[in-house]
Amino acid sequence: MNYGEKSPALWDAIKSEEKRQEDTIELIASENIVSDAVREAQGSVLTNKYAEGYPGKRYYGGCQYIDKVEQLAIDYAKKLFNAEYANVQPHSGSQANMTVYNALLKPGDTILGMGMDAGGHLTHGSKVNFSGKIFNSISYDLNPETEELDFDRIRQLAIEKKPKLIIAGASAYSRIIDWQKFREIADEVGAYLMVDMAHIAGLVATGAHPSPVPIADVVTTTTHKTLRGPRGGMILSNNKELGKKIDSALFPGTQGGPLEHVIAAKAQAFYEDLQPEFTQYIDQVIKNSKAMAEEFKNSKNIRVVSGGTDNHLMIIDITKTGVTGKDAQNLLDSVNITTNKESIPGDKRSPFITSGLRIGTPAITSRGFKEPDAKEVAKIIIEVLDKPEDAGVLAEAKERVNDLVQKYPIK
């Protein structure tokens, strides 16, 4: 075999995935479509270079251009979020969160984060995750009537449990989050406040959601999702002294060599996010999300959790359709709509089955969908879930999906 000869099986799978993305309406809220420039940066020769350490303080030689790349990513990130400190090396959002915990906590310390069925993330204290195994994790839920954050209850839990760290942010919450209320609770009990804004980072960057950066001690995020960059993580803060602890907690504390080709792709994405067109994009993401939510609210069998959305996603309760979240996910897959099953607040079904779906609009907006198109997608979902065994309905749904993806090809 010649060096560099392609594996036919591998490239067949890659081409098949490319076709799947082109032919599918992508509604997974954490997915998006990156630019060719982001992909080019990630596939560059930077993948060949080891660069343990930070710009100007490397353990290897030959890092002069790597330093320029990483410093650009840092500078763009700081400008994008008006932050004093940025670390762009975390391999993922989970690694970013782990790094912050390692910097601020000791094993056994108490953390207070959003529960999974309320919309929280595994790394916010789930018992099956490192965050719930290494630390004493306490979860807060939503107000059962409004299905929104219950700050009185969060404050009560904080006073009772005395956490060293309070975690704000979510992976499945559709409303504006009041960071200042979290700050007041954290100050009252003497806790650090960490915000995980992985899902809404793009909205924060454009001002479509209030920024946690001036309020929290530290902010973590992914660099994909609404930032439309490569898969990876980042840590921000306005506290430079805390930043020094985070730097050492990440390297050598949590990771070794950074993925500089991914950091280059992060820099390119942040550069794109700083352009005026990105603000227009995020505005359209929210318009599409609200349009879909309104269409679902007009359905007799689908309920939108909390009654609507303020951001890029919504959770829909499909209990009345008689279809589980798992079956709905598979059913929609069959008509080329990709979404994911999601627990609803107080869900009696397991997280592997669920009574809901999470719907997000970042990827369809990147393709060019506008409000009428978003409404059409919602109508297709409603009809499929209302008549899940009607072959005619499913065939028509697939045709309507095909019309939309042909109208808005991935560029």
From Swiss-Prot:
Chain sites annotated for binding (6S)-5,6,7,8-tetrahydrofolate: G120, H121, L122, S350, P351, F352
Catalysed reaction, written as an equation: (6R)-5,10-methylene-5,6,7,8-tetrahydrofolate + glycine + H2O = (6S)-5,6,7,8-tetrahydrofolate + L-serine
EC numbers, comma separated: 2.1.2.1
Residues modified to N6-(pyridoxal phosphate)lysine: K225
GO biological process annotation, one example: glycine biosynthetic process from serine
Enzyme class, first EC level, given as a word: transferase
Cofactor requirements of the protein: pyridoxal 5'-phosphate
Protein name per UniProt: Serine hydroxymethyltransferase
A GO molecular-function descriptor: pyridoxal phosphate binding
